[in-house]
């Protein structure tokens, strides 16, 4: 009977034939020798396939969840745009981790490993492993904030399983160097020189209007922007704030997450800024200081878009500190490293050419 084990990898040995586990630990705490090669995998859960592609291991994928089969006018997932072949692969289940064990068992070639993010969503990892007999490795997707160590550990774990340890370290180093560059450009801005900003239209499991924001919006933090929605006790994720608060804050500059365009011409953040009398009193609206950003929360965090947005925001807030930066070119530099192709213009066209530009309002 196959032993149930989830996370796992205490050590790996590299051989000419691939990667084999020197030791694993099962769910009961048993340490078992179990050599194997990992040439075929599936990635379950938001962002899981993104991490695999960051590691340049897309050739190991044997099936995808149903979100990868969809093609819509709007798509802000650079990894999917850079690798359209994923959409023609077999399907193993529904998105957000709702895996189908029967479909997984029917795959040919069969996966040796299932990677899974957000284990609380969809199919329980232990039950999935019991039903399929395939090891399920749970990954903490983390973020660019306080959970950055978890993100890095997940990349390293995935890298060890796939024999992509060096690539995992390169990705981590790239992120750290990019974040350090942003800090070097803006770290000495005095508190009184920080611009007051607000970002609206933040997506959360779908598009939202202008009141949807994020108090801990990562790009603001990377360039020392003063996020007016960041108040004592504010949650870290997306929240909807009262319109009256936005008016009272009266930010110097407004940014719009362009995922809000999915709501259509008669709804969403841009429409609200144009038509809602409450927003007409905002000084940023009157001055035309409203700018479009790439959506970054699209089947979990797009880490490349977070960094690209930070460079654009920095250039708008402190142009003298970002004079050498072309935001579109910088975005493509980031995407080329992370997903293998420059996909900025593809996304810009999908979002009406409004990415990294002043948004015209009626």
Q: Which stretches of residues belong to each language-model region?
A:
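Pocket-lining segment of extracytoplasmic ligand-binding domains
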Residues: 228-279
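Bacterial N-terminal signal peptides
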Residues: 5-15
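Structural recognition of the beta-strand scaffold that forms the well-ordered cores
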Residues: 42-44, 62-65, 112-117, 136-140, ...
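Solvent-exposed loop/turn segments at secondary-structure junctions
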Residues: 47-50, 67-70, 118-122, 142-146, ...
């Amino acid at each position: 009977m196959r032993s149930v084990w989830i996370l796992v990898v205490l050590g790996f040995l590299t051989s000419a034939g691939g990667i084999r586990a020197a030791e694993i630990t099962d769910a009961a705490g048993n340490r078992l020798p179990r050599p194997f090669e990992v040439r075929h995998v599936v990635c379950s859960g938001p962002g899981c396939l993104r991490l695999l592609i960051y590691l340049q291991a897309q050739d190991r994928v044997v099936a995808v969840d149903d979100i990868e089969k969809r093609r819509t006018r709007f798509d802000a997932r650079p990894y999917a745009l850079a690798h359209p072949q994923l959409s023609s692969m077999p399907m193993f289940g529904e998105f957000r981790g709702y895996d189908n064990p029967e479909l997984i068992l029917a795959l040919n070639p069969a996966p040796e490993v299932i990677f899974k993010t957000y284990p609380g969503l969809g199919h329980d990892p232990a039950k999935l492993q019991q039903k399929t007999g395939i090891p399920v490795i749970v990954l903490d997707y983390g973020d660019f904030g306080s959970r950055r160590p978890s993100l890095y550990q997940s990349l390293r774990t995935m890298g060890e399983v796939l024999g992509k340890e060096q690539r995992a370290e390169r990705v981590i180093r790239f992120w750290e160097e990019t974040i350090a560059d942003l800090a070097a450009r803006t770290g000495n801005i005095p508190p009184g020189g920080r611009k007051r900003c607000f970002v609206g239209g933040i997506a959360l499991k779908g598009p939202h209007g202008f009141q949807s924001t994020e108090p801990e919006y990562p790009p603001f933090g990377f360039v020392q922007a003063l996020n007016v929605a960041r108040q004592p006790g504010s949650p870290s994720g997306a929240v909807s704030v009262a319109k009256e608060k936005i008016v009272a804050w009266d930010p110097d500059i407004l940014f719009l997450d362009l995922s809000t365009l999915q709501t259509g011409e008669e709804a969403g953040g841009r429409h609200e800024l144009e038509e809602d009398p409450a927003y007409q009193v905002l000084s940023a609206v009157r001055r035309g200081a409203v700018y479009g950003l790439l959506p970054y929360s699209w089947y979990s965090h797009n880490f490349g878009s977070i960094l690209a947005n930070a460079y654009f925001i920095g250039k708008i807030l402190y142009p003298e500190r970002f004079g050498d930066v072309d935001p579109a070119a910088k975005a493509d530099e980031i995407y080329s490293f992370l997903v293998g192709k420059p996909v900025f213009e593809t996304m810009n066209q999908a979002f009406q050419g409004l990415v990294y530009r002043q948004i015209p309002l009626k």
